[in-house]
């Protein structure tokens, strides 16, 4: 399904064709994208979302926090998705203007979903993704950003909202923030469960983005050797 596990290029846009191809071939399945610091994970996620919406798909986006979700949605707007196709329930403590379509509650979000049966993006934390009324409006894709911080339990609970799941993140960069203890490996993060004991995501499960633009080359070499089996460039 996925082919080479390593995405290589001088620009994040070089990676998009492979990701788009793999995402379109998912059939009630899941894949992941492991991107170390500075590899453009959120950029890739937002451009993939834009392509899916242009193809008529409905995409749900989740992370642990309102701020993280809104970061992805703002990138989706920057990518060119119209505000009218980007939905989210407003954080109750946030009264600022938004570039996307903000709703005051899950009930008003449901009304918006009912009135807009076509392609769109809906962002939310686990509370929104697991809301019984919201889940009635099925999505084609569920995309989780910073999936190394997103608990496996939350992913299982939210997974019923969509036919396909795509995880973006890096367990080597940010680990799960939840400290609760559960038996049987359930305490693992969503992406940590995918990767298992490996430093690099297995090729049959997704892609490793190998080029970072954030660090000095000499520092990148050290980090690559210590955490990424020498594959980060």
Predicted segments, located by residue:
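Conserved helicase motor core of SF1/SF2 NTP-dependent helicases
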Residues: 54-56, 63-67, 75, 79, ...
């Amino acid at each position: 399904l996925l082919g080479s596990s390593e995405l290589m290029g001088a620009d994040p846009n070089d990676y998009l064709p492979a990701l788009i191809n793999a995402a379109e071939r998912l059939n009630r399945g899941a894949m992941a994208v492991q991107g170390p610091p500075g590899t453009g994970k959120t950029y890739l996620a937002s451009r993939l979302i834009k392509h899916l919406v242009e193809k008529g798909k409905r995409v749900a986006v989740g992370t642990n926090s309102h701020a993280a979700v809104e970061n992805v949605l703002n990138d989706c707007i920057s990518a060119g998705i119209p505000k009218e196709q980007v939905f989210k329930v407003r954080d109750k403590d946030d009264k600022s203007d938004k570039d996307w379509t903000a709703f005051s509650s899950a009930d008003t979000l449901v009304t918006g979903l009912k009135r807009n049966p076509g392609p769109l993006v809906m962002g939310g934390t686990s509370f929104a993704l697991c809301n019984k009324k919201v889940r009635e409006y099925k999505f084609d894709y569920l995309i989780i950003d910073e999936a190394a911080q997103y608990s496996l339990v939350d992913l299982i609970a939210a997974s019923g909202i969509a036919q396909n799941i795509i995880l973006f993140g890096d367990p080597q960069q940010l680990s799960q923030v939840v400290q609760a203890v559960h038996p049987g490996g359930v305490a693992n993060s969503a992406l940590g469960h995918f990767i298992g004991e490996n430093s690099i995501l297995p090729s049959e499960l997704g892609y490793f983005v190998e080029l970072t633009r954030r660090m000095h080359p000499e520092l990148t070499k050290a980090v690559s050797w210590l955490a990424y089996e020498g594959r980060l460039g």
